[in-house]
Regions:
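Active-site-adjacent substrate-recognition loops and nearby beta-strands
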Residues: 11-20, 41-63, 67-90, 102-117, ...
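Extracytoplasmic/secreted envelope proteins and their assembly/folding machinery
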Residues: 26-30, 54, 63, 75, ...
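Structural recognition of the beta-strand scaffold that forms the well-ordered cores
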Residues: 1-6, 30-33, 38-42, 64-67, ...
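Hydrolase catalytic cores
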Residues: 1-3, 97-161
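Hydrophobic, small-residue-rich alpha-helical packing segments that form membrane-like cores
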Residues: 5, 22, 28, 32, ...
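Sec-exported extracytoplasmic/periplasmic mature domains
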Residues: 8, 30-34, 44, 68-71, ...
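Residue-level detector of functionally pivotal "anchor" positions at catalytic/ligand-binding pockets or at interdomain
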Residues: 172-195
Length: 196
C-alpha cells in the first residue's frame, strides 16, 4: 500500500524536534512503515520562510519526503530544505510542484494550475504505486530505496533536491546489491601457533 499526505507541522516544534523520533505525526508514519505501508509526504512550503526546513512528518526516517521543482528542474523557492536535526538528507526526492495542473475544487471539468509540495508529493506517490505494481515482491523500503537510488542526484545528494528528481522507469528496473555469494568467500588460511 502507498499513502500520500500533504500535511506538516512545525507550530508546536523547534528545529531540534525534527530528529525523526519526536513529532507525533512522524511516529505514526514510522509505525505505518513498519507495517509495510510506503508513506509519501510533502516536504513543506517553508523554503522561503524563516522556518526554512522540512516539517513533521517529513522528518521520519522511513518516509519519502518530496520537494518541489519547476518545469526546468530548478528547485522551487518555497520547497522546504533539509537536513533533519540529526543530519539526514531531506527531502528524499523532488517532483514537479510549480504550476501543476489540477481540477478546480468547485467543478468537475475546469482545470487550473497550482504550486506547492502538496502537488509534488502525489506525483511521487503515483510513481511509487507504479513501481510497486511492476515489482510486487518488493517491500515498501525496497521501493523507497529504488526511488532514491535512481533519482537524478543519487550520487551527490544534497539538502535542497535530496537524491534528485525521481525517475520512475529507472526505479522500476533498479537492481539491488545483494552482497557476496557463498562461493565468492575466500577461506581464511591464517594459522595460529601456540605461544612459547
Amino acid at each position: 500500500d502507498v499513502t500520500c499526505a500533504s500535511l506538516g507541522y512545525y507550530d508546536w516544534y523547534e528545529y531540534d524536534d525534527l530528529d525523526g523520533n519526536t513529532a507525533a505525526t512522524t511516529i505514526v508514519v514510522d509505525i505505518a512503515s513498519s507495517l509495510g505501508v510506503l508513506c509519501v509526504n510533502s516536504a513543506g512550503n517553508e523554503g522561503d520562510d524563516p522556518w526554512y526546513y522540512i516539517i513533521a512528518p517529513a522528518d521520519a526516517d522511513s518516509v519519502i519526503s518530496v520537494g518541489a521543482v519547476n518545469r526546468d528542474g530548478t528547485i522551487a523557492n518555497f520547497s522546504s530544505r533539509g537536513p533533519t536535526y540529526d543530519g539526514r538528507i531531506k527531502p528524499e526526492v523532488c517532483a514537479l510542484g510549480v504550476s501543476t495542473y489540477c481540477v478546480r475544487s468547485n467543478t468537475e471539468d475546469i482545470y487550473r494550475t497550482a504550486s506547492g509540495t502538496s502537488f509534488s508529493a502525489p506525483l511521487a506517490a503515483g510513481a511509487a504505486a507504479v513501481i510497486m505494481s511492476a515489482n510486487p515482491e518488493w517491500t515498501n523500503m525496497q521501493v523507497r530505496e529504488a526511488i532514491m537510488m535512481t533519482a537524478s542526484l543519487s550520487n551527490i545528494p544534497d539538502n535542497i533536491y535530496g537524491y534528485g528528481i525521481l525517475n520512475t522507469w529507472a526505479a522500476i528496473n533498479y537492481q539491488f546489491t545483494t552482497g557476496l555469494k557463498n562461493e565468492e568467500i575466500i577461506p581464511n588460511i591464517l594459522k595460529v601457533f601456540d605461544a612459547y
